């Protein structure tokens, strides 16, 4: 939380020095003889005098030291002169005594330590300088550095929950988030003549900084916020030897509520477990979404051995989270109402939404394939009304004009299911042909329900029944011939006996 304080320190220091300088000029291009308003605003840019660029602040010599934590014994009254940017310090003591006065170390108070700002909007914070007015000889030069430290999130979530529980969420250096290279946004300086200087900004009008000399206030705006602005601002006040005096942190929390929440409950076959996935799309930051499950209104707890969650980040769109759960047995339980409850939380902001789905249960159909009277015949029992039949010959789909399918009745064991019969002429091509009867319309693999058989039309297969037929005919002829002969013999013998008598 150093960033908010640093920013505040910088703002207040600049304002304070403006008030103290006997001939304070707020802009490098403004004449001291011109009256200026108490409010100064500017974008970070190169402010120079006579075309000279901003000079570097000298480094502190090794023998120098800064006096701190001393209290002032004199009361100061600050009055702003009208018509000039100067301030008169009325002291109870003389100038000689004034030169020996000591003052408290300045402090910076910011209005917040965290700025929650939604995507594409503007984030703001204000800092105020708290310090006894020092003399110009003591505080003749200072620097306020505004530094941005980005925080980038890892593209995996193995430690998301652990980091959240441990309070490491958003902390640089944790397994969940880490800082990229820091960047100087602006360096604001006041010289002994009361002129304010600032370094150029590489971001154009991305940042807007203003100073109010009356209230000793500095404000910072971050415009059109995007994911790259997530991090913390660091406000550092340095003395004229470039030594840091105050360091404040203000965290910039980029926010984005989930764009959508959906529950996917895929269909299952009777006897399998119900499964569901909750998809939370396009939110920020990762870890700001909490998912809970309900089954028919009752709390359902995912199992660690087979359920879980994972997320990924899409550039320009935010994070997407998928949470999964496994429930019950579809062969025993009726299809449940599965609900996913999502809570998005950032700071004091909470947004909740939910989605519900009911899975569909399919029953295993019964089908068989046989050959009869020159047809391949497929008999199907207990299929939904949307199921149709497709024939394949040698694994090649056949036009539906080559076969026909009819409904033969209703299934006796499953409501709203029916029985079908489909047939296709077999090929009389003197070869062995594969016929496949496949059910189409199930939300599973296409070959999930099918039956295949071979029809043998080779000469060898055809020869066997012919031999049997010829043999049968010859056998019958022999039997008939023998019967005729025996009958004739019997009649002949009977006739001879009658003649003898």
UniProtKB/Swiss-Prot annotation:
<dbReference type="InterPro" id="IPR001038">
    <property type="entry name" value="GA_GC"/>
</dbReference>
<feature type="glycosylation site" description="N-linked (GlcNAc...) asparagine; by host">
    <location>
        <position position="46"/>
    </location>
</feature>
<keyword id="KW-0732">Signal</keyword>
<dbReference type="InterPro" id="IPR001654">
    <property type="entry name" value="Marek_A"/>
</dbReference>
<dbReference type="Pfam" id="PF02124">
    <property type="entry name" value="Marek_A"/>
</dbReference>
<dbReference type="GO" id="GO:0016020">
    <property type="term" value="C:membrane"/>
</dbReference>
<feature type="glycosylation site" description="N-linked (GlcNAc...) asparagine; by host">
    <location>
        <position position="212"/>
    </location>
</feature>
<keyword id="KW-1043">Host membrane</keyword>
<feature type="glycosylation site" description="N-linked (GlcNAc...) asparagine; by host">
    <location>
        <position position="120"/>
    </location>
</feature>
<keyword id="KW-0812">Transmembrane</keyword>
<dbReference type="GO" id="GO:0005576">
    <property type="term" value="C:extracellular region"/>
</dbReference>
<dbReference type="GO" id="GO:0020002">
    <property type="term" value="C:host cell plasma membrane"/>
</dbReference>
<keyword id="KW-0964">Secreted</keyword>
<feature type="glycosylation site" description="N-linked (GlcNAc...) asparagine; by host">
    <location>
        <position position="91"/>
    </location>
</feature>
<feature type="glycosylation site" description="N-linked (GlcNAc...) asparagine; by host">
    <location>
        <position position="354"/>
    </location>
</feature>
<feature type="glycosylation site" description="N-linked (GlcNAc...) asparagine; by host">
    <location>
        <position position="429"/>
    </location>
</feature>
<dbReference type="InterPro" id="IPR007110">
    <property type="entry name" value="Ig-like_dom"/>
</dbReference>
<feature type="glycosylation site" description="N-linked (GlcNAc...) asparagine; by host">
    <location>
        <position position="100"/>
    </location>
</feature>
<comment type="similarity">
    <text>Belongs to the herpesviridae glycoprotein C family.</text>
</comment>
<keyword id="KW-0472">Membrane</keyword>
<feature type="domain" description="Ig-like">
    <location>
        <begin position="258"/>
        <end position="356"/>
    </location>
</feature>
<comment type="function">
    <text>May play an immunoevasive role in the pathogenesis of Marek's disease. It is a candidate for causing the early-stage immunosuppression that occurs after MDHV infection.</text>
</comment>
<feature type="signal peptide">
    <location>
        <begin position="1"/>
        <end position="27"/>
    </location>
</feature>
<keyword id="KW-0945">Host-virus interaction</keyword>
<keyword id="KW-0325">Glycoprotein</keyword>
<feature type="glycosylation site" description="N-linked (GlcNAc...) asparagine; by host">
    <location>
        <position position="400"/>
    </location>
</feature>
<feature type="transmembrane region" description="Helical">
    <location>
        <begin position="466"/>
        <end position="492"/>
    </location>
</feature>
<feature type="topological domain" description="Cytoplasmic">
    <location>
        <begin position="493"/>
        <end position="501"/>
    </location>
</feature>
<keyword id="KW-1032">Host cell membrane</keyword>
<dbReference type="InterPro" id="IPR036179">
    <property type="entry name" value="Ig-like_dom_sf"/>
</dbReference>
<protein>
    <recommendedName>
        <fullName>Envelope glycoprotein C homolog</fullName>
    </recommendedName>
</protein>
<feature type="region of interest" description="Disordered">
    <location>
        <begin position="53"/>
        <end position="86"/>
    </location>
</feature>
<keyword id="KW-0393">Immunoglobulin domain</keyword>
<feature type="topological domain" description="Virion surface">
    <location>
        <begin position="28"/>
        <end position="465"/>
    </location>
</feature>
<feature type="compositionally biased region" description="Low complexity">
    <location>
        <begin position="62"/>
        <end position="72"/>
    </location>
</feature>
<keyword id="KW-1133">Transmembrane helix</keyword>
């Amino acid at each position: 939380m150093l960033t908010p304080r640093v920013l505040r320190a910088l703002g207040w220091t600049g304002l304070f020095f403006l008030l103290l300088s006997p001939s304070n000029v707020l802009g490098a291009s403004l004449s001291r003889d011109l009256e200026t308003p108490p409010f100064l605003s500017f974008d970070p840019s190169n402010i120079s005098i006579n075309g000279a660029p901003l000079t570097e602040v000298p480094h502190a010599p090794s023998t120098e030291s800064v006096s701190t934590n001393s209290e002032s014994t004199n009361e100061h009254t600050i009055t702003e002169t009208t018509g000039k940017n100067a301030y008169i310090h009325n002291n109870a003591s003389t100038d000689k005594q004034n030169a020996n006065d000591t003052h408290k170390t300045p402090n910076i108070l910011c209005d917040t330590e965290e700025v929650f700002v939604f995507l594409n909007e503007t984030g703001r914070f204000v800092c105020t300088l708290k310090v006894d007015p020092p003399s110009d000889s003591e505080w003749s030069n200072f620097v306020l550095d505004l530094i941005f430290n980005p925080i980038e999130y890892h593209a995996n979530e193995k430690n998301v929950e652990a980091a959240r529980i441990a309070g490491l969420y958003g902390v640089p250096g944790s397994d969940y988030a880490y800082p990229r290279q820091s960047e100087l946004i602006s360096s604001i300086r006041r010289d002994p003549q009361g002129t304010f200087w600032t370094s150029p900004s590489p971001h154009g009008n991305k940042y807007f900084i203003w100073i109010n000399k009356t209230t000793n206030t500095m404000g910072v705006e971050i415009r059109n916020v995007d994911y790259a602005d997530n991090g913390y601002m660091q406000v550092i006040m340095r003395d004229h030897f470039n030594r840091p005096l105050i360091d404040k942190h203000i965290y910039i929390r980029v926010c984005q509520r989930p764009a959508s929440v959906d529950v996917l409950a895929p269909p299952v076959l009777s006897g399998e477990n119900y499964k569901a996935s909750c998809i939370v799309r396009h939110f920020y930051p990762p870890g700001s979404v909490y998912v809970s499950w309900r089954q028919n209104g009752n709390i359902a707890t995912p199992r660690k051995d087979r359920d879980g969650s994972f997320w990924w980040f899409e550039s320009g769109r935010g994070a997407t989270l998928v949470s999964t759960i496994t429930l019950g047995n579809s062969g025993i339980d009726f299809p449940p109402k599965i609900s996913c409850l999502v809570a998005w939380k950032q700071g004091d902001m909470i947004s909740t939404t939910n989605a519900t789905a009911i899975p569909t249960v399919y029953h295993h159909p019964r089908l068989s394939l046989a050959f009869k009277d020159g047809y391949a015949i497929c008999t199907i029992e207990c299929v939904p009304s949307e199921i149709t039949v497709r024939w394949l010959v040698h694994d090649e789909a056949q036009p539906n004009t080559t076969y026909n399918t009819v409904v033969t009745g209703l299934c006796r064991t499953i409501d709203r299911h029916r029985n079908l019969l489909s047939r296709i002429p077999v090929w009389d091509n003197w070869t062995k042909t594969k016929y496949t009867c496949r059910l189409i319309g199930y939300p599973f693999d296409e070959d999930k329900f099918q039956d295949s058989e071979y029809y043998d039309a080779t000469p060898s297969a055809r020869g066997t029944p012919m031999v049997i037929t010829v043999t049968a005919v010859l056998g019958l002829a022999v039997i008939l011939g023998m019967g005729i002969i025996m009958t004739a013999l019997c009649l002949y013998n009977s006739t001879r006996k009658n003649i003898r008598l």
